[in-house]
Amino acid sequence: IINIRHFTRYLNATGKRAYIPSSEYNVKTRRYQPYIFNDYELSRLFDEIDSLKNRRGSEASNPHLILPVLFRLELCCGMRPGEPLNLRVEDVNLRNGDIFIRKSKRGKDRHIIMSEEMRQLCTAYDGIAGEREWFFPYTDGGKIPVRWVMWNFNKAWNKTGLPIRFNKPRPYDLRHSFATQTLMRWVDEGRDVMTLMPYLSTYMGHVSMEETLYYVHLLPERIKSSPGINWDMMGDIYSAEEDFYEED
């Protein structure tokens, strides 16, 4: 419906009369509500992540070295949970902070730049990890399985003892928090959010701007009213998308 709506608008703009389907034609499906961490929750969560230790008999090695870096990449660089696991050593340039993400969602490659603080953390980890193929290696030298990452994230969250405000947090929600924190920082700095949105979209590897604009609607009400967010420019993108948003 969204593609048809955009196409019929284009036809009308070129002088050809065409019916533009209204929102009543939208397919209604349940949308997952991302868990956006507050500062205290993130502080408690990473306290527990930083203190995780290996289980007796576990096949994974050095969780106390790997997990603090891996989860911070997701939070500080907006990476999808599987992307850090697919990094080879040569994909992480520790001199300039460039990370090459290969064949991620929909087979797309992209480059992202780490902050200086994140680069220093990765450099310190690299010096300890030694010779290897994968930036975050499994005990057999291969890639770490997603199930191990999920298990440790859940373990860390449960150890915080924090109440769950709605849906239980997942590693993917670190990526969502990165997006909303970036938008809130731009608003606080008085920047034009709509002008900067394409940069965030490219950085996160989104296929379309609609996927990135979704995050505007997760912001607190006081921020959504900022002059840096031009709702007229957004049109009805979100109203058309909101009932069938695909997590990206």
Predicted regions and their residues:
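Conserved catalytic core of the tyrosine transesterase superfamily
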Residues: 1-248
